[in-house]
């Protein structure tokens, strides 16, 4: 059986957007900071070939290739600690744009990508697991995102890195049907 954790119904969300030439430095900071974050913080990467028109994306950046680092404070969204944590994570590197807001988890965060991945679309996803997000791994991911993954075509794709931290890592792999808990970095290509 699974145990759910009560929080919300709202959460503090933040996103920072980076062009290719700033992405590597931002991802290196992300890799250095993420392992030390507390359990109530989620911080992930979405490398988009064409940034969708999300509420925090300036109009001139819609449709351009951008790396997005997005964070979630999964505790009291109005707490000073949460506000400062999100601001700290948005200050990583030199973002082209940032935005933060208090949003509903269920109808906000869980539906965040519905427009990009609508019902009926035949999505194909592959996943890899890394124990370390090294400089070489970051270079390979950015190169693949910038030069592959539909670059120069109309193909829309996403390369994502989800850090598996928090309470998910506190449960032994043999105690759950959820495998690969010993791997901090999950890389998804969609």
Q: Where are the predicted features?
A:
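Soluble FAD-dependent oxygen oxidases
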Residues: 1-190
